[in-house]
Regions:
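Short amphipathic beta-strand/extended segments with alternating polar/hydrophobic composition
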Residues: 47-56, 68-80, 127-130, 184-189
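Short, solvent-exposed secondary-structure boundary motifs
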Residues: 11-23, 36-44, 88-100, 115-121, ...
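Short, solvent-exposed aromatic-acidic interface loops
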Residues: 41-47, 64-70, 142-146, 173-179
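Gly/Pro-enriched, hydrophobic low-complexity segments
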Residues: 113-195, 199
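Flexible, processing/modification-adjacent segments and terminal tails
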Residues: 61-119, 148
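Short, exposed beta-strand/loop patches in secreted or surface proteins that constitute
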Residues: 26-31, 51-52, 102-108, 128, ...
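N-terminal mature ectodomain segment of secretory-pathway/periplasmic proteins
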Residues: 2-68
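Short, hydrophobic/aromatic-rich segments at coil-to-beta transitions
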Residues: 3-8, 32-39, 108-116, 136-138, ...
């Protein structure tokens, strides 16, 4: 079982669905026994920190190294959104997706299932689609775009490879499925990943 994960990635990111892509590099740390993560992403313009720590979700964006232009936390919508991110990125540490008291799978058909996760008063779910190799193709849920707007949010892992004896996706794309269409805003490629190393890179 994986208890800790640390990874590095590169890729592209959009700060707004109507903005251009910017290059990004990041590193991320996960805990599994108690849900938690810290992600730090750097672009030429800003540094973003996304996290779920001590059962609280938080997003901080900084420019010029010291000026916080975004600091969002303290509401259940953000706690739920960041916990959804943690769960949606479990493909990088798939023992996290084994059935437990908190996590249940319900078959839908031969290639899809509902993943339910109950934790700290929050009830989350994903509709998960698999390919013929039983690799996750897509995870779909409802996530808050802001405090009041709940929309369809999709994680698409791909390019599966073996790392430390575990088959994981080395790339992932994230997008919103809105009535106007699908809007991708993050494309990450894992460049380094290690398990059960709780210390910082």
């Amino acid at each position: 079982y994986v208890s800790y994960v640390r990874l590095k990635h590169n890729g592209q990111f959009k700060t707004n669905l109507t903005k251009d892509w910017v290059n990004i590099v990041g590193e991320q740390y996960f805990t599994t026994e108690k849900p938690g993560f810290i992600w730090k992403g750097k672009t030429a313009m800003f540094v973003a920190r996304d996290m779920y720590l001590a059962d609280e979700g938080r997003l901080i964006a900084t420019i010029l190294s010291t000026i916080n232009v975004v600091d969002i936390h303290g509401k259940q919508q953000y706690d739920e959104s960041e916990l959804l991110r943690w769960l949606g990125e479990s493909g990088w540490f798939p023992t996290n997706l084994l059935p437990s008291e908190k996590l249940k799978w319900t078959a839908i058909d031969n290639s899809s299932a509902k993943l339910s996760f109950d934790y700290n008063g929050l009830s989350l779910y994903y509709i998960v689609h698999f390919n013929s190799a039983n690799e996750i193709l897509e995870m779909e849920t409802k996530r808050y775009m802001n405090e009041k707007r709940l929309e369809t949010w999709i994680v698409k892992p791909n390019n599966y490879e073996e790392r430390s004896g575990i088959i994981i996706p080395m790339q992932a794309e994230v997008f919103w499925r809105l009535k106007e269409g699908d809007f991708s805003y993050a494309k990450f490629k894992v460049t380094e990943i290690e398990y059960n190393r709780p210390e910082k890179f």
